[in-house]
């Protein structure tokens, strides 16, 4: 049995968690390693693990598995010394650093062996009684979760495994807790990442068709219909055989590859190719989408309208969006519990990069965003998470999909997100701690509302009951009444609604006289009101930030501050002081978002892409466009939506960018498809004679 004393030698055993149908280690690596020793877990997990550890310590390469029938696919753990892994440039998924058994103090003994403290643990898992096979699976899953940077939360709501900056993930697994056979393992993070999950699969289908005219598009639709009809289209995706799944995935891959070729050809010849995107959760669903768009095609082309379905299929026959892609950054308060919960599994390298750049945990306010009982956020916390969510989505679209915006603007504090996300500010992460402690956000325009107290000349003993209300009304009607209600302010003008803020009783009295009903936001913030003007110099100082050495030259930044009389529609100069002044001007005065969108359209903005949590700003822009009767010329796209699946919403966003003929990369879609084709072929062949490994590495 394992040495359970405090003098146990420290372990550094490299672990690789291998799914049943994973690809194999290369022949070159296998040739430089010892022959594989197969160890199966029968009815005693501890004994099998102890044997495996001894074998590794003797220089062996071990494959730990469950006892299964011959050739039956199974999950496997590959174990070898950390030194051997390093010499062969293998990126382990985790390290086994401590193992103790036969003591109710096993966790303390295992931690001592691993040279770790209990405070180092970022995750602890304890199981009372488990059978040997369940113990193996618990071990396997923890290694896999470390490699996926995934924490299993309550209600099967997994999320990213956040850590403090430059601190590795350390986890403990205690089995048969509080018994004489209790055992504990301590696992630490290594450099290996499991490969990204595929954005597309048999239940997330995505096809792109392009053609010069209606006839060409109709032919393409009919051809795809025939190819899909040749597959078993009456089965649910999970009921398809590996061969049928492989054929379906290969069809998607071939389609997207062909589209890329067509786009490249049309780009060199300057010919615009109208493009249809079809999406569906099954073959049957896509066939229904084909039928629907085939029927609608003549009318859509004749009217040059935009076609969209709930499944995400879309078609814009004559888009006018090229050169007019506008990133729109939402304001404070759009973040929601569990946002972006799935993204890290599909973009692991991006999350690893963001983690290296700064404090990702603080950037997304993870403890409140992903906690089991998400807590109410302060204004400062909402501001941080809002900028963080926009920063993440910007990197995802720009780095992964190579989307390049032509314009950028922000709703309210979204202007700060804009400068932070698009390569203008050198160190946007520095603002996280400043926002948490700055009196601007903690007391002046939120919390105690000291700026309001000063403006209203109140004593510390006098109470302020502040609120804001969304009211469906034109701004002129509200402005006409403001002199009668000096403690109520028109904060925001946004399409067919306005935001009224101030003393709750005063606002309610104004609404009563107006004959309108307001929806209370129940959020304490004096942004965009007269009292905020006293904070102008402080806000300017706060946002005076050093700029990147190389600044974006192809993006036109539009600020609401440009609408103010003193700025006379002059574009913001890209220097620290001008940017800070523009944010302060926007922050401290009424925001006319309607005028901002109209100004953007006048400058050439056409396709408004919301870059942040939820789609609240998209809804506002849609209303403004409808009021102005420009829905054919101007469209909105949301990259995220509360209540929807992160990846499904993202794919709908990508689909609309494609049909609007916006240049982008399809590599994130194709990579996952190619991986699946290879995996399904391997599963179908059932000839797993090599040791599987998927070792996407990240820099140490």
Predicted feature descriptions by range:
Residues 267-269, 410, 488-494, 498, ...:
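Short beta-strand
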Residues 12-19, 23-30, 36-38, 52, ...:
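Conserved small-residue
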Residues 2-12, 16-20, 24-25, 80, ...:
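Flexible catalytic loop/linker elements that gate and position reactive groups at enzyme active sites
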Residues 26-59, 64, 69-71, 115-139, ...:
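Conserved catalytic cysteine-centered active-site region
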Residues 227-231, 296-301, 487-489, 511-523:
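A common structural junction motif
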Residues 271, 451-462, 518-608:
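Acyltransferase
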Residues 152-166, 299-310, 317, 385-409, ...:
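Flexible, low-complexity segments
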Residues 211, 280, 305-477, 526, ...:
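FabD-like malonyl-/acyl-CoA
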